[in-house]
């Protein structure tokens, strides 16, 4: 006999969990569509050569890579952005530019499994391809804010930085292995200051004084300063080199655009330590954390990548986008008790007291569905206790009972499973009026 078990870092979803996830994905999809983003799909499995060039050394260690039955070198996608680059290169002539897309799908990384972190997880990506305008960067942040608010999340912070600022800091301190240094800096939250110092010393051949001065600059944060105060405080850095100057100027322009969009200034702050470990980022980058739940990590991250298609096409296309980590958000929303705990999407359960009443019950159920109310018929004619127990377990809001009197008079008796209220022999229209009073629960 085989023991039923699930691999570490992977999980089954029971109906309640799957319903919760579907509801959240539906809400963010509506937000994406409201901004004009259109859906696309790409395969879970790609040629390894498609995925590997843009993966950091850490990500490469986590990629599920193997030979398929045709002896081809293939890998499971680790994000949705690299497949997007391949997709755009293949189809750009028919897509039209600029191109705004969203994609929702599972990705795979062999990282250490822990709370809120899985080896298979769902990403919700939205990207603006084919424009270098900072208006696009501002819109991506606007979509992040709208998406989190659609999920009833208000207490969060988007930490913003610019890769040119980090490149400029590395240039100022004479760091030659810039990508490696930034990959290590990106692990500041994960391995701490001492861990980063050790890795920089080992991997980038930097002396301790240089490392300490570099990390002191990398840890510059806006914190409670106003935007104007912060930009005044860091103005001197623009004289260090062109990278720092360009990065800070872009952030100043971005803040003007976000101000025009009237996004609350409490929701976004500059943090020079935000690096994003993926090597394809070239411009503004951001990570979003929930205040009071920092240990969960980033729930939405992204940035600008101005060499999106360089590995696949001579025609270079810029892009900017972000990815919502829906699985981490489910963990957070569950702890905050903001999730629907029902194990059904049907609002009404119809129970029959006799086999001959099923034809009437099915007609009632179909009429309810046509009125926009999800309904199901309990499949057995039994004592009322069993369907009531079933409804309590699943989370139906109402049970409609069809007994002899209801069958003869073509009415139904209705019980609200939340309040305990029971009304007998109602007409369909009256029952519909009562059931429909709480349509927001559908």
Swiss-Prot record:
Its recorded reaction(s) are:
tRNA(His) + L-histidine + ATP = L-histidyl-tRNA(His) + AMP + diphosphate + H(+)
What EC number(s) would the UniProt record show?
6.1.1.21
Q: Which InterPro entries match?
A: aa-tRNA-synth_II (IPR006195), aa-tRNA-synth_II/BPL/LPL (IPR045864), Anticodon-bd (IPR004154), Anticodon-bd_dom_sf (IPR036621), His-tRNA-ligase (IPR015807), HisRS-like_core (IPR041715), HisRS/HisZ (IPR004516), HisRS_anticodon (IPR033656)
List cellular component terms (GO): cytoplasm
Location(s) in or outside the cell = Cytoplasm
Q: Which UniProt keywords apply?
A: Aminoacyl-tRNA synthetase, ATP-binding, Cytoplasm, Ligase, Nucleotide-binding, Protein biosynthesis
Keyword ATP-binding on this protein?
A: yes
- Name the principal localization, coarsely classed: cytoplasm
Biological process terms from the Gene Ontology for this record are: histidyl-tRNA aminoacylation
Q: Top-level EC class, please?
A: ligase
GO MF annotation terms: ATP binding; histidine-tRNA ligase activity
Q: List the Pfam families.
A: HGTP_anticodon (PF03129), tRNA-synt_His (PF13393)
Coiled-coil region list: none
> Which family is this protein grouped under?
Belongs to the class-II aminoacyl-tRNA synthetase family.
Q: How does it assemble?
A: Homodimer.
Identification of the protein by name: Histidine--tRNA ligase
